[in-house]
Protein backbone atom coordinates (compact mmCIF):
# COMPACT_ATOMS: atom_id res chain seq x y z
CA UNK A 1 0.00 0.00 0.00
CA UNK A 2 1.45 3.36 -1.03
CA UNK A 3 1.44 6.56 1.01
CA UNK A 4 -1.60 7.96 -0.82
CA UNK A 5 -3.67 4.88 -0.05
CA UNK A 6 -2.63 5.03 3.60
CA UNK A 7 -3.59 8.69 3.86
CA UNK A 8 -6.96 7.97 2.25
CA UNK A 9 -7.56 5.04 4.60
CA UNK A 10 -6.70 7.23 7.60
CA UNK A 11 -9.16 9.91 6.45
CA UNK A 12 -11.84 7.26 5.97
CA UNK A 13 -11.49 6.08 9.56
CA UNK A 14 -10.50 9.24 11.41
CA UNK A 15 -13.90 10.94 11.20
CA UNK A 16 -16.00 8.09 12.62
CA UNK A 17 -13.32 7.26 15.23
CA UNK A 18 -13.07 10.85 16.48
CA UNK A 19 -16.85 11.24 16.46
CA UNK A 20 -17.28 7.98 18.38
CA UNK A 21 -14.53 8.85 20.86
CA UNK A 22 -16.02 12.28 21.56
CA UNK A 23 -19.55 10.94 21.87
CA UNK A 24 -18.38 8.15 24.17
CA UNK A 25 -16.62 10.66 26.40
CA UNK A 26 -19.78 12.76 26.74
CA UNK A 27 -21.95 9.70 27.46
CA UNK A 28 -19.52 8.34 30.04
CA UNK A 29 -19.08 11.72 31.75
CA UNK A 30 -22.81 12.05 32.38
CA UNK A 31 -23.37 8.40 33.32
CA UNK A 32 -22.79 6.35 36.45
CA UNK A 33 -19.75 4.13 37.04
CA UNK A 34 -16.08 4.35 36.13
CA UNK A 35 -15.33 6.77 33.31
CA UNK A 36 -13.00 4.48 31.33
CA UNK A 37 -15.41 1.53 31.43
CA UNK A 38 -18.28 3.75 30.36
CA UNK A 39 -16.22 5.35 27.61
CA UNK A 40 -15.19 1.97 26.19
CA UNK A 41 -18.78 0.67 26.26
CA UNK A 42 -20.13 3.74 24.46
CA UNK A 43 -17.26 3.69 21.95
CA UNK A 44 -17.87 0.03 21.08
CA UNK A 45 -21.53 0.78 20.40
CA UNK A 46 -20.96 4.07 18.60
CA UNK A 47 -18.13 3.23 16.18
CA UNK A 48 -19.90 0.67 13.95
CA UNK A 49 -23.01 2.84 13.82
CA UNK A 50 -20.89 5.88 12.95
CA UNK A 51 -19.55 3.99 9.95
CA UNK A 52 -23.10 3.03 8.98
CA UNK A 53 -24.26 6.63 9.35
CA UNK A 54 -21.44 7.90 7.16
CA UNK A 55 -22.23 5.28 4.52
CA UNK A 56 -25.91 6.25 4.62
CA UNK A 57 -25.02 9.93 4.32
CA UNK A 58 -22.87 9.30 1.23
CA UNK A 59 -25.52 7.09 -0.30
CA UNK A 60 -28.07 9.86 0.32
CA UNK A 61 -26.02 12.30 -1.75
CA UNK A 62 -23.35 13.43 0.69
CA UNK A 63 -24.90 16.90 1.09
CA UNK A 64 -23.88 19.12 4.00
CA UNK A 65 -27.54 19.78 4.74
CA UNK A 66 -28.20 16.07 5.28
CA UNK A 67 -25.13 15.80 7.52
CA UNK A 68 -26.45 18.69 9.63
CA UNK A 69 -29.86 17.01 9.83
CA UNK A 70 -28.34 13.71 10.93
CA UNK A 71 -26.13 15.34 13.55
CA UNK A 72 -29.06 17.39 14.85
CA UNK A 73 -31.32 14.33 15.06
CA UNK A 74 -28.64 12.42 16.94
CA UNK A 75 -27.46 15.25 19.19
CA UNK A 76 -30.91 16.44 20.26
CA UNK A 77 -32.04 12.97 21.32
CA UNK A 78 -28.83 12.00 23.08
CA UNK A 79 -28.54 15.45 24.68
CA UNK A 80 -32.11 15.38 25.96
CA UNK A 81 -31.62 11.88 27.32
CA UNK A 82 -28.43 12.73 29.20
CA UNK A 83 -29.93 15.98 30.51
CA UNK A 84 -33.05 14.18 31.72
CA UNK A 85 -31.02 11.45 33.38
CA UNK A 86 -29.15 14.04 35.43
CA UNK A 87 -31.88 16.66 35.99
CA UNK A 88 -34.87 14.48 36.91
CA UNK A 89 -33.45 13.37 40.30
CA UNK A 90 -33.16 17.07 41.19
CA UNK A 91 -36.18 18.66 39.48
CA UNK A 92 -38.54 15.70 39.20
CA UNK A 93 -41.09 14.52 41.73
CA UNK A 94 -39.33 13.23 44.88
CA UNK A 95 -42.00 10.58 45.54
CA UNK A 96 -41.56 8.94 42.11
CA UNK A 97 -38.81 6.25 42.26
CA UNK A 98 -38.24 6.17 38.49
CA UNK A 99 -37.69 9.92 38.36
CA UNK A 100 -35.21 9.77 41.21
CA UNK A 101 -33.25 7.30 39.08
CA UNK A 102 -33.41 9.56 36.01
CA UNK A 103 -36.14 7.75 34.05
CA UNK A 104 -39.00 9.67 32.43
CA UNK A 105 -41.27 6.63 32.24
CA UNK A 106 -42.11 3.96 34.74
CA UNK A 107 -42.27 1.38 31.92
CA UNK A 108 -38.64 2.00 31.00
CA UNK A 109 -37.59 1.99 34.66
CA UNK A 110 -39.24 -1.36 35.46
CA UNK A 111 -38.00 -2.99 32.25
CA UNK A 112 -34.47 -1.73 32.80
CA UNK A 113 -34.54 -2.79 36.44
CA UNK A 114 -35.49 -6.32 35.42
CA UNK A 115 -32.77 -6.42 32.75
CA UNK A 116 -30.12 -5.15 35.19
CA UNK A 117 -31.11 -7.75 37.78
CA UNK A 118 -30.91 -10.60 35.26
CA UNK A 119 -27.57 -9.42 33.86
CA UNK A 120 -25.90 -8.98 37.26
CA UNK A 121 -27.34 -11.87 39.27
CA UNK A 122 -28.05 -14.66 36.78
CA UNK A 123 -25.07 -14.34 34.40
CA UNK A 124 -27.04 -15.49 31.33
CA UNK A 125 -25.45 -16.83 28.16
CA UNK A 126 -25.69 -14.84 24.94
CA UNK A 127 -28.73 -16.68 23.57
CA UNK A 128 -30.55 -17.43 26.83
CA UNK A 129 -32.27 -13.97 27.08
CA UNK A 130 -33.89 -14.61 23.69
CA UNK A 131 -35.85 -17.60 25.00
CA UNK A 132 -37.27 -16.27 28.25
CA UNK A 133 -40.34 -14.20 29.07
CA UNK A 134 -40.19 -10.83 30.80
CA UNK A 135 -42.57 -9.19 33.21
CA UNK A 136 -42.01 -5.72 31.77
CA UNK A 137 -41.41 -6.29 28.05
CA UNK A 138 -43.98 -8.34 26.16
CA UNK A 139 -41.98 -8.10 22.91
CA UNK A 140 -38.58 -8.95 24.54
CA UNK A 141 -36.48 -6.76 22.23
CA UNK A 142 -35.64 -3.91 24.59
CA UNK A 143 -35.13 -6.25 27.54
CA UNK A 144 -32.76 -8.51 25.59
CA UNK A 145 -30.82 -5.52 24.26
CA UNK A 146 -30.46 -4.11 27.78
CA UNK A 147 -29.31 -7.44 29.19
CA UNK A 148 -26.65 -7.83 26.52
CA UNK A 149 -25.35 -4.30 27.08
CA UNK A 150 -25.22 -4.67 30.86
CA UNK A 151 -23.68 -8.14 30.78
CA UNK A 152 -21.02 -7.56 28.13
CA UNK A 153 -20.30 -3.82 28.19
CA UNK A 154 -21.49 -2.29 31.45
CA UNK A 155 -21.34 -4.81 34.30
CA UNK A 156 -20.15 -2.25 36.85
CA UNK A 157 -22.98 0.30 36.57
CA UNK A 158 -26.50 0.66 35.22
CA UNK A 159 -25.79 2.92 32.24
CA UNK A 160 -29.16 3.13 30.53
CA UNK A 161 -27.72 6.08 28.62
CA UNK A 162 -26.21 3.42 26.33
CA UNK A 163 -29.75 2.46 25.27
CA UNK A 164 -30.50 6.14 24.63
CA UNK A 165 -27.31 6.35 22.54
CA UNK A 166 -28.42 3.44 20.35
CA UNK A 167 -31.91 4.91 19.93
CA UNK A 168 -30.47 8.26 18.85
CA UNK A 169 -28.25 6.51 16.29
CA UNK A 170 -31.21 4.57 14.89
CA UNK A 171 -33.27 7.74 14.46
CA UNK A 172 -30.38 9.56 12.78
CA UNK A 173 -29.89 6.63 10.40
CA UNK A 174 -33.39 7.18 9.04
CA UNK A 175 -32.73 10.79 7.94
CA UNK A 176 -30.93 10.18 4.59
CA UNK A 177 -33.42 7.48 3.59
CA UNK A 178 -36.45 9.58 4.45
CA UNK A 179 -35.22 12.74 2.74
CA UNK A 180 -34.00 10.94 -0.39
CA UNK A 181 -37.33 9.13 -0.74
CA UNK A 182 -39.30 12.38 -0.65
CA UNK A 183 -36.84 14.28 -2.84
CA UNK A 184 -36.99 11.67 -5.60
CA UNK A 185 -40.71 10.86 -5.35
CA UNK A 186 -42.08 14.37 -4.73
CA UNK A 187 -39.82 17.45 -4.61
CA UNK A 188 -36.90 18.94 -2.63
CA UNK A 189 -39.07 21.43 -0.73
CA UNK A 190 -41.34 18.74 0.68
CA UNK A 191 -38.27 16.60 1.39
CA UNK A 192 -36.46 19.32 3.35
CA UNK A 193 -39.49 20.42 5.37
CA UNK A 194 -40.48 16.84 6.23
CA UNK A 195 -36.90 15.92 7.16
CA UNK A 196 -36.60 18.91 9.50
CA UNK A 197 -39.91 17.95 11.13
CA UNK A 198 -38.53 14.43 11.56
CA UNK A 199 -35.44 15.91 13.22
CA UNK A 200 -37.06 18.49 15.49
CA UNK A 201 -40.46 17.04 16.38
CA UNK A 202 -40.59 17.38 20.20
CA UNK A 203 -42.29 14.09 21.10
CA UNK A 204 -39.74 12.21 19.02
CA UNK A 205 -36.94 13.88 20.97
CA UNK A 206 -38.59 13.24 24.35
CA UNK A 207 -39.35 9.55 23.76
CA UNK A 208 -35.97 8.93 22.15
CA UNK A 209 -34.29 10.44 25.20
CA UNK A 210 -36.02 8.02 27.53
CA UNK A 211 -34.60 4.54 26.80
CA UNK A 212 -37.79 3.56 24.95
CA UNK A 213 -38.47 1.52 21.80
CA UNK A 214 -39.92 4.46 19.83
CA UNK A 215 -36.63 5.78 18.34
CA UNK A 216 -35.73 2.32 17.05
CA UNK A 217 -39.12 1.89 15.39
CA UNK A 218 -39.16 5.43 13.98
CA UNK A 219 -35.74 4.97 12.39
CA UNK A 220 -36.74 1.64 10.85
CA UNK A 221 -40.00 3.12 9.54
CA UNK A 222 -38.09 5.98 7.91
CA UNK A 223 -36.03 3.41 6.01
CA UNK A 224 -39.18 1.44 5.19
CA UNK A 225 -40.73 4.65 3.85
CA UNK A 226 -37.85 4.92 1.38
CA UNK A 227 -38.35 1.30 0.33
CA UNK A 228 -42.04 1.94 -0.39
CA UNK A 229 -41.31 5.14 -2.33
CA UNK A 230 -38.82 3.30 -4.56
CA UNK A 231 -40.60 -0.04 -4.93
CA UNK A 232 -41.70 0.81 -8.48
CA UNK A 233 -38.11 1.64 -9.51
CA UNK A 234 -36.29 -1.44 -8.17
CA UNK A 235 -38.78 -3.70 -6.49
CA UNK A 236 -36.35 -6.49 -5.53
CA UNK A 237 -33.98 -4.23 -3.58
CA UNK A 238 -36.83 -2.24 -2.06
CA UNK A 239 -38.70 -5.41 -1.08
CA UNK A 240 -35.57 -6.81 0.59
CA UNK A 241 -35.04 -3.59 2.57
CA UNK A 242 -38.72 -3.47 3.52
CA UNK A 243 -38.68 -7.08 4.69
CA UNK A 244 -35.53 -6.44 6.73
CA UNK A 245 -37.14 -3.44 8.42
CA UNK A 246 -40.28 -5.39 9.32
CA UNK A 247 -38.23 -8.28 10.74
CA UNK A 248 -36.18 -5.86 12.86
CA UNK A 249 -39.40 -4.26 14.15
CA UNK A 250 -40.77 -7.55 15.46
CA UNK A 251 -38.64 -7.71 18.64
CA UNK A 252 -39.72 -4.16 19.49
CA UNK A 253 -43.43 -4.37 18.63
CA UNK A 254 -45.35 -6.97 16.65
CA UNK A 255 -48.27 -4.53 16.54
CA UNK A 256 -46.21 -1.85 14.79
CA UNK A 257 -44.67 -4.45 12.49
CA UNK A 258 -48.17 -5.60 11.54
CA UNK A 259 -49.23 -1.99 10.89
CA UNK A 260 -46.16 -1.55 8.69
CA UNK A 261 -47.14 -4.66 6.72
CA UNK A 262 -50.67 -3.29 6.26
CA UNK A 263 -49.56 0.07 4.86
CA UNK A 264 -46.95 -1.70 2.71
CA UNK A 265 -49.56 -3.98 1.14
CA UNK A 266 -51.89 -1.04 0.55
CA UNK A 267 -49.08 0.98 -1.02
CA UNK A 268 -48.04 -1.89 -3.32
CA UNK A 269 -51.67 -2.54 -4.27
CA UNK A 270 -52.14 1.11 -5.35
CA UNK A 271 -48.73 1.27 -7.03
CA UNK A 272 -49.02 -1.88 -9.14
CA UNK A 273 -52.51 -3.37 -9.15
CA UNK A 274 -55.39 -0.95 -8.51
CA UNK A 275 -54.92 0.96 -11.76
CA UNK A 276 -54.82 -2.15 -13.96
CA UNK A 277 -58.55 -2.80 -14.01
CA UNK A 278 -61.71 -2.48 -11.96
CA UNK A 279 -61.35 -6.13 -10.96
CA UNK A 280 -58.02 -5.42 -9.26
CA UNK A 281 -59.43 -2.26 -7.71
CA UNK A 282 -62.56 -3.76 -6.19
CA UNK A 283 -60.83 -7.05 -5.48
CA UNK A 284 -58.31 -5.19 -3.36
CA UNK A 285 -61.03 -3.21 -1.60
CA UNK A 286 -62.98 -6.41 -0.86
CA UNK A 287 -59.86 -8.20 0.38
CA UNK A 288 -58.99 -5.24 2.59
CA UNK A 289 -62.49 -5.16 4.07
CA UNK A 290 -62.43 -8.92 4.67
CA UNK A 291 -58.99 -8.67 6.28
CA UNK A 292 -60.19 -5.94 8.62
CA UNK A 293 -63.19 -8.04 9.66
CA UNK A 294 -61.03 -11.11 10.34
CA UNK A 295 -58.47 -9.03 12.26
CA UNK A 296 -61.17 -7.43 14.38
CA UNK A 297 -62.80 -10.79 15.07
CA UNK A 298 -59.51 -12.36 16.17
CA UNK A 299 -58.14 -9.39 18.08
CA UNK A 300 -61.35 -7.98 19.56
CA UNK A 301 -61.07 -9.73 22.96
CA UNK A 302 -57.51 -8.45 23.48
CA UNK A 303 -58.40 -5.00 22.15
CA UNK A 304 -61.35 -4.74 24.54
CA UNK A 305 -59.15 -5.75 27.46
CA UNK A 306 -56.45 -3.19 26.62
CA UNK A 307 -58.95 -0.41 25.94
CA UNK A 308 -60.95 -1.08 29.10
CA UNK A 309 -57.82 -0.99 31.25
CA UNK A 310 -56.41 2.19 29.67
CA UNK A 311 -59.73 4.02 29.73
CA UNK A 312 -60.30 3.03 33.35
CA UNK A 313 -56.80 4.27 34.23
CA UNK A 314 -57.44 7.61 32.50
CA UNK A 315 -60.72 8.08 34.37
CA UNK A 316 -59.09 7.32 37.72
CA UNK A 317 -56.26 9.77 37.07
CA UNK A 318 -58.59 12.59 36.00
CA UNK A 319 -61.62 13.50 38.06
CA UNK A 320 -63.16 15.77 35.41
CA UNK A 321 -62.80 13.08 32.72
CA UNK A 322 -64.64 10.64 34.99
CA UNK A 323 -67.34 13.29 35.53
CA UNK A 324 -67.77 13.97 31.80
CA UNK A 325 -67.91 10.25 30.98
CA UNK A 326 -70.58 9.86 33.64
CA UNK A 327 -72.60 12.64 32.00
CA UNK A 328 -72.47 11.28 28.44
CA UNK A 329 -72.97 7.65 29.45
CA UNK A 330 -70.65 4.65 29.54
CA UNK A 331 -71.60 3.57 26.01
CA UNK A 332 -69.90 6.67 24.61
CA UNK A 333 -66.84 6.78 26.82
CA UNK A 334 -64.52 5.01 24.34
CA UNK A 335 -65.45 7.46 21.57
CA UNK A 336 -65.11 10.47 23.87
CA UNK A 337 -61.71 9.41 25.19
CA UNK A 338 -60.49 8.57 21.68
CA UNK A 339 -61.37 12.09 20.50
CA UNK A 340 -59.96 13.56 23.70
CA UNK A 341 -56.75 11.61 23.14
CA UNK A 342 -56.22 13.23 19.74
CA UNK A 343 -55.89 16.58 21.54
CA UNK A 344 -53.15 15.20 23.82
CA UNK A 345 -50.90 16.64 25.06
CA UNK A 346 -53.48 19.41 25.64
CA UNK A 347 -51.64 22.72 25.35
CA UNK A 348 -54.04 24.82 27.49
CA UNK A 349 -53.99 22.19 30.25
CA UNK A 350 -50.20 22.17 30.39
CA UNK A 351 -49.95 25.95 30.34
CA UNK A 352 -52.10 26.39 33.45
CA UNK A 353 -51.79 23.07 35.30
CA UNK A 354 -50.60 23.18 38.88
CA UNK A 355 -48.95 21.97 41.00
CA UNK A 356 -45.96 20.84 38.94
CA UNK A 357 -42.21 21.30 38.71
CA UNK A 358 -40.38 23.63 36.34
CA UNK A 359 -38.88 20.64 34.52
CA UNK A 360 -42.21 18.96 33.82
CA UNK A 361 -43.81 22.26 32.85
CA UNK A 362 -41.05 22.91 30.29
CA UNK A 363 -41.21 19.38 28.86
CA UNK A 364 -45.01 19.51 28.69
CA UNK A 365 -45.09 22.84 26.85
CA UNK A 366 -42.34 21.64 24.50
CA UNK A 367 -44.34 18.53 23.58
CA UNK A 368 -47.70 20.28 23.26
CA UNK A 369 -46.40 23.13 21.10
CA UNK A 370 -44.92 20.57 18.71
CA UNK A 371 -48.20 18.68 18.29
CA UNK A 372 -50.38 21.79 18.02
CA UNK A 373 -48.01 23.33 15.47
CA UNK A 374 -48.34 20.17 13.35
CA UNK A 375 -52.10 19.55 13.67
CA UNK A 376 -53.59 22.17 11.28
CA UNK A 377 -51.13 21.33 8.48
CA UNK A 378 -51.51 17.59 9.04
CA UNK A 379 -55.31 17.51 9.08
CA UNK A 380 -55.53 19.98 6.22
CA UNK A 381 -53.36 17.61 4.19
CA UNK A 382 -55.30 14.49 5.17
CA UNK A 383 -58.55 16.08 4.01
CA UNK A 384 -57.07 17.69 0.88
CA UNK A 385 -55.77 14.59 -0.89
CA UNK A 386 -59.10 14.31 -2.73
CA UNK A 387 -58.21 17.48 -4.62
CA UNK A 388 -55.07 16.07 -6.24
CA UNK A 389 -55.70 15.89 -9.99
CA UNK A 390 -53.49 12.95 -10.94
CA UNK A 391 -55.57 9.81 -10.32
CA UNK A 392 -52.76 7.46 -9.32
CA UNK A 393 -51.11 10.06 -7.11
CA UNK A 394 -54.46 10.81 -5.49
CA UNK A 395 -55.08 7.12 -4.82
CA UNK A 396 -51.67 6.68 -3.20
CA UNK A 397 -52.07 9.76 -1.02
CA UNK A 398 -55.62 8.76 -0.10
CA UNK A 399 -54.59 5.28 1.05
CA UNK A 400 -51.79 6.73 3.16
CA UNK A 401 -54.07 9.45 4.56
CA UNK A 402 -56.66 6.88 5.62
CA UNK A 403 -53.92 4.84 7.25
CA UNK A 404 -52.59 7.86 9.17
CA UNK A 405 -56.09 8.83 10.34
CA UNK A 406 -56.70 5.24 11.41
CA UNK A 407 -53.37 5.06 13.23
CA UNK A 408 -54.02 8.34 15.09
CA UNK A 409 -57.48 7.14 16.15
CA UNK A 410 -56.30 3.65 17.15
CA UNK A 411 -53.39 5.15 19.11
CA UNK A 412 -55.79 7.38 20.98
CA UNK A 413 -58.28 4.59 21.60
CA UNK A 414 -55.57 2.11 22.64
CA UNK A 415 -54.12 4.60 25.14
CA UNK A 416 -57.49 5.67 26.53
CA UNK A 417 -56.78 9.35 25.96
CA UNK A 418 -53.65 9.27 28.12
CA UNK A 419 -51.34 12.27 27.68
CA UNK A 420 -48.21 10.09 27.47
CA UNK A 421 -49.13 6.72 25.96
CA UNK A 422 -51.36 8.15 23.23
CA UNK A 423 -48.69 10.48 21.72
CA UNK A 424 -46.16 7.72 22.28
CA UNK A 425 -47.97 5.34 19.92
CA UNK A 426 -48.77 8.16 17.51
CA UNK A 427 -45.17 9.36 17.12
CA UNK A 428 -43.92 5.94 16.02
CA UNK A 429 -45.16 6.66 12.48
CA UNK A 430 -43.48 10.07 12.48
CA UNK A 431 -42.25 9.69 8.86
CA UNK A 432 -45.87 9.61 7.67
CA UNK A 433 -46.91 12.48 9.97
CA UNK A 434 -43.94 14.60 8.84
CA UNK A 435 -44.58 13.87 5.17
CA UNK A 436 -48.25 14.86 5.24
CA UNK A 437 -47.50 17.98 7.29
CA UNK A 438 -44.90 19.10 4.73
CA UNK A 439 -47.07 18.07 1.78
CA UNK A 440 -50.05 20.01 3.19
CA UNK A 441 -48.01 23.19 3.63
CA UNK A 442 -46.55 22.99 0.11
CA UNK A 443 -49.90 22.08 -1.47
CA UNK A 444 -51.72 25.00 0.19
CA UNK A 445 -48.98 27.41 -0.75
CA UNK A 446 -48.89 26.23 -4.36
CA UNK A 447 -52.64 26.62 -4.96
CA UNK A 448 -52.98 29.59 -2.55
CA UNK A 449 -55.62 27.72 -0.56
CA UNK A 450 -57.48 29.51 2.26
CA UNK A 451 -58.62 26.21 3.75
CA UNK A 452 -55.32 25.90 5.58
CA UNK A 453 -55.97 29.23 7.30
CA UNK A 454 -59.41 27.95 8.35
CA UNK A 455 -57.83 24.88 9.98
CA UNK A 456 -55.42 27.18 11.84
CA UNK A 457 -58.28 29.43 12.99
CA UNK A 458 -60.28 26.42 14.21
CA UNK A 459 -57.31 25.29 16.27
CA UNK A 460 -56.89 28.80 17.71
CA UNK A 461 -60.58 28.77 18.70
CA UNK A 462 -60.04 25.45 20.48
CA UNK A 463 -56.94 26.73 22.28
CA UNK A 464 -58.62 30.01 23.22
CA UNK A 465 -61.77 28.57 24.77
CA UNK A 466 -60.01 25.72 26.54
CA UNK A 467 -57.36 28.12 27.84
CA UNK A 468 -60.20 30.01 29.52
CA UNK A 469 -61.64 26.75 30.84
CA UNK A 470 -58.35 25.44 32.24
CA UNK A 471 -57.23 28.82 33.58
CA UNK A 472 -60.51 29.28 35.46
CA UNK A 473 -60.20 25.71 36.74
CA UNK A 474 -57.00 26.52 38.62
CA UNK A 475 -57.62 30.24 39.20
CA UNK A 476 -61.36 30.35 39.92
CA UNK A 477 -60.98 33.51 42.00
CA UNK A 478 -59.62 35.42 38.98
CA UNK A 479 -62.03 34.56 36.16
CA UNK A 480 -65.48 33.02 35.76
CA UNK A 481 -65.40 29.44 34.54
CA UNK A 482 -67.60 28.24 31.68
CA UNK A 483 -69.20 24.81 32.15
CA UNK A 484 -67.43 22.12 30.14
CA UNK A 485 -70.26 21.42 27.72
CA UNK A 486 -70.86 25.12 27.16
CA UNK A 487 -67.18 25.47 26.26
CA UNK A 488 -67.50 22.58 23.81
CA UNK A 489 -70.63 24.17 22.31
CA UNK A 490 -68.85 27.50 21.78
CA UNK A 491 -65.95 25.72 20.07
CA UNK A 492 -68.25 23.70 17.79
CA UNK A 493 -70.34 26.73 16.81
CA UNK A 494 -67.34 28.97 16.10
CA UNK A 495 -65.57 26.20 14.19
CA UNK A 496 -68.72 25.51 12.16
CA UNK A 497 -68.94 29.18 11.19
CA UNK A 498 -65.28 29.21 10.11
CA UNK A 499 -65.75 25.96 8.23
CA UNK A 500 -68.92 27.22 6.53
CA UNK A 501 -67.10 30.20 5.04
CA UNK A 502 -65.20 27.76 2.88
CA UNK A 503 -68.46 26.78 1.17
CA UNK A 504 -70.27 30.13 1.27
CA UNK A 505 -67.50 32.11 -0.43
CA UNK A 506 -67.32 29.88 -3.57
CA UNK A 507 -71.13 29.84 -3.72
CA UNK A 508 -71.36 33.64 -3.61
CA UNK A 509 -68.61 33.88 -6.22
CA UNK A 510 -70.47 31.46 -8.48
CA UNK A 511 -73.74 33.40 -8.11
CA UNK A 512 -72.00 36.68 -8.95
CA UNK A 513 -70.30 35.19 -11.99
CA UNK A 514 -73.68 33.84 -13.12
CA UNK A 515 -75.26 37.27 -12.85
CA UNK A 516 -72.39 38.84 -14.76
CA UNK A 517 -72.74 36.21 -17.44
CA UNK A 518 -76.50 36.76 -17.65
CA UNK A 519 -76.13 40.49 -18.05
Model-derived regions, located:
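Transmembrane-helix motifs of polytopic, lipid-linked glycan transferases
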Residues: 146, 162-185, 376-380
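Short hydrophobic/aromatic helix or loop-helix immediately within or flanking a transmembrane segment
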Residues: 107-156, 252, 341
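Transmembrane-helix signature of polytopic, membrane-embedded enzymes
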Residues: 157-164, 178-200
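Transmembrane alpha-helix segments characteristic
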Residues: 16-22, 241-242, 390-413
Amino acid sequence: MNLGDGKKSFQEWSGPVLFSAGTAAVVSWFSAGAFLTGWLAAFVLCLPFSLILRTGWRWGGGEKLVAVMMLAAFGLRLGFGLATQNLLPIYGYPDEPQQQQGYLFDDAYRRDDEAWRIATTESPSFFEPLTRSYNNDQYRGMAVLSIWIYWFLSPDARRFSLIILLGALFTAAGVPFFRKALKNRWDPQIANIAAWIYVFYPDSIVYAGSAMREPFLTGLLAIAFWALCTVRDHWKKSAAVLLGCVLLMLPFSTFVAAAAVVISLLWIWVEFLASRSKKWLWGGVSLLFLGLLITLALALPSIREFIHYDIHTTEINSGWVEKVVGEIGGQFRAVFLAVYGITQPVLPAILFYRPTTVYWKAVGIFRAVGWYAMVPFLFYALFSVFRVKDRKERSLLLVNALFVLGWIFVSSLRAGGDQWDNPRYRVIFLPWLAFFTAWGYCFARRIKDWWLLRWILIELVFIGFFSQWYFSRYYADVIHRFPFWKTVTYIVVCSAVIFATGFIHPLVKKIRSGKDGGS
